[in-house]
């Protein structure tokens, strides 16, 4: 019974398939599809041809671009700079003026700034900042110590003044939410030719005014700048006298200790004898 049912089902499917094919071929859409010729599209023509809506043949316009050669001297550099993002393309000073400070130069400048601050004996708040390349060559964003800013500045953007050792004042913009100097700092850095490794002593002499002292990584430069600053960097006579007294006292103590040692040795020898 099941076999007869399966055979009848297969016969019915075959009849339906034949009927569907005969009806589909008779449709006009199928006849149009059969008559259509598919030609391969040339991709080279599509790449070079510009899209046009007009069916009119375009008139050929003569061009003199190939006959004239204009050398501006900057085209190659501009093309190269578009694809290169090296640090040298963003610096604001000549490349031969930019230096890479050594560890010894950075430490020497930082210690010179701290020593000068101790000799000032100023009651004003201060901090020492060591310069890096982004501070003085390219980015010109100077981040300040967060604790110093929280203690002395409000959390808002305001204008402050930067005074150098010669008394010249520069206007700058302090951004409180980022605790740093932005506008105006670039001019100060370029005018004073600050380099990588320089140490700057920032002294807040007024609520919105910094007195800035520059210390170079080169020791000779620090010596010449110290002479310009005057007696502020050299110890006073009282300090020199105190140092001499300390040296004399230490020498007397050493001499007395040696004398006591000698006397004790002599006593031991006498007792043994």
From Swiss-Prot:
Residues 258-273 have a biased composition (Basic residues). The keyword Lipoprotein does not apply. Residues 236-252 have a biased composition (Acidic residues). GO terms for molecular function: DNA binding. Keywords: DNA-binding, Nucleus, Transcription, Transcription regulation. Residues 127-218 bind DNA. GO terms for cellular component: nucleus. This is Putative B3 domain-containing protein At5g58280. It is found in: Nucleus. Residues 225-273 are annotated as: Disordered. It holds the Pfam family B3. The keyword Ubl conjugation does not apply.
């Amino acid at each position: 019974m099941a076999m007869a049912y399966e055979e009848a089902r297969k016969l019915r499917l075959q009849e339906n398939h034949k009927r569907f094919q005969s009806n589909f071929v008779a449709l006009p859409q199928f006849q149009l599809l059969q008559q259509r010729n598919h030609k391969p599209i040339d991709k080279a023509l599509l790449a070079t041809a510009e899209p046009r809506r007009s069916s009119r043949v375009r008139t050929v316009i003569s061009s003199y671009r190939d006959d004239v050669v204009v050398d501006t001297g900057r085209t190659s550099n501009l093309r190269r700079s578009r694809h290169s993002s090296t640090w040298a393309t963003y610096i604001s000073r000549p490349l031969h003026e930019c230096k890479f400070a050594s560890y010894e130069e950075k430490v020497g400048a930082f210690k010179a700034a701290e020593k000068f601050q101790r000799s000032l004996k100023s009651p004003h708040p201060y901090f020492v900042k060591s310069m890096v390349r982004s501070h003085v060559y390219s980015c010109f964003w100077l981040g300040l110590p967060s604790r110093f800013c929280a203690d002395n500045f409000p959390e808002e953007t305001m204008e402050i003044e930067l005074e150098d050792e010669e008394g010249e004042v520069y206007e700058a913009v302090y951004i409180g939410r980022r605790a740093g100097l932005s506008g105006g700092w670039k001019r100060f850095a370029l005018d004073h030719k600050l380099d990588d490794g320089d140490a700057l002593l920032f002294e807040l002499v007024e609520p919105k005014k910094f007195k800035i002292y520059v210390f170079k990584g080169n020791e000779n430069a620090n010596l010449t700048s110290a002479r310009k600053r005057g007696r502020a960097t050299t110890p006073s006579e009282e300090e020199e006298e105190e140092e001499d007294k300390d040296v004399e006292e230490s020498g007397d103590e050493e001499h007395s200790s040696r004398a006591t040692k000698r006397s004790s040795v002599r006593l031991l020898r006498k007792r043994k004898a």
